[in-house]
Structures are given as C-alpha cells and as structure tokens.
C-alpha cells in the first residue's frame, strides 16, 4: 500500500478502529505499540533454532490478529515453493492451531490453506502488484481474482450471517458497480495516499530497464515462486535486511502461467529494474523450467470453516 505515495500504514489501534467505523476499511502494519513483545520473541526463536516451530508461529501470528480487535478473522495460510510451510499438511496443521487460538479468544474464525508453488497473480513487485490488484477491482479475471472472491464469500458469510452464495453475489456486484474500486480510493485518501494512482497506473511506474526471460525449452512451464521472490528482493524490490529502502518500481511480470505449453525461446516474463544485478537476473531466469508433464495444484487445498 505504500506504493501509493504518502500512504501511512503506521496507524495506532485507535486510528485503525476509528477509520473502520467511519469508512468501513483500513490497512495497517505492525507498530512498536502493537504486540511489542513479538519482535523479542522472534529474536529468541532465531537464536534457538525454533523459527519453524508451528506453536510459536501460531502464537506470533495470532497475537497480532487478536490485537486488531477484529471479531471475525479469516486466515490465508500458504504452502509450497514460495511459502514458509512447504507441505500442505504442515500448513493445515498451522491453520487449525491458529483457528483454535482465535476461537478460544472469542473470535469467529475461518482459514484457507492455499497453494504458492508458483506466483498467485501475474505480477511481482510493489507497484506492479498494486496495479494488478486495481485491475482485479476493475474486473480482471485470474487466480488472484478467484482467490479474492473465495475469501470474500467465506468472510462475509461468517461476519454477516448470510449464505455463501449471497456473499459472493454481493462481492461480484461491488466489482461490477465500481463500489470496490471506490472503497479502495476512500481508504487510500483517508490514510494520506495519492488517490490519483488508483485511477492512473502511470503514477505507479515500473523501473526503467527491462530484460525479457525466455523459455529454456519446449514443454509445460514450471515456475518457482521462491526464486522469483528472491530475485525481486535482490533487485531492490524488497528488504534483505532491516532498514533497506524498497524500490517500488522493481517488477517481474509473467507473460505465461505455470502449466502453460511453451516453445523454446518464447517470452515468458519481463524483469524491470533500475540497478542491474547479475545474480538476481540469473535467479529470475532459473525460476523458469520446462517439463513434459505438469500437475497443477488446486488453488485452495482445504478450508476450515465454522463447522470444523
């Protein structure tokens, strides 16, 4: 959201709650006043080799969720190549534990275990991902849109006590009518962001240099989400250490999706960067492989609802 120039994610709990009551939405990051012990706990996990402990991950995640005062919470727990949890069974175990914690704290909870073997959308990088999110709110159909509508269906049904069919219909109508895009603009404006960028993607620029990545062979395309994420980060699109400045214009745009049939030499992606880093570009190229047989994973592996 900080791709919107001036956007303030550092809201206090009071500011967050007030904005939600006023306009129906807010986006905030973790601040020093929000679960301040969590960073210390993570530091302890780091030096005791317990970073991947499922109970400690669950307590860390849920401490922040419960501090938000939300009475209905939906969790999207990723698994796969680009996720912290590689195996779907481990992701589901984590999801069930977090749902249990939330319910014991009196919250209505649900969770979806979803696949991140390859990128969810067609874009990687701050400005590029915001552009794609805006496109979805304008009606673009892709996996990002499918998963977003799935989440809307489940969360609205749980929060409002309506059927999932009605919840989905309301979500689809909000996109078709332009209400969803208008709500994003309200949130951006309320938090000090440049609302013009919601309607003008040129205000969310991509980096000045572009390298085309081509298929290394003929067959079905296989894409590593982890390799692309690391490449984007190394090119400046993410922080490699605390205090690093993020270049919001760095981007990787997919021209073909995982599982698509491709011919050797066919363009499969574009990498946008301002500072050339050979290792990062090599990582991006290496993220694309071709195989003769490709088994797509379901977008949603499992769902833990109110009855589970």
Residue spans of the language-model regions?
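Well-ordered secondary-structure scaffolds
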Residues: 50-53, 57, 64-308
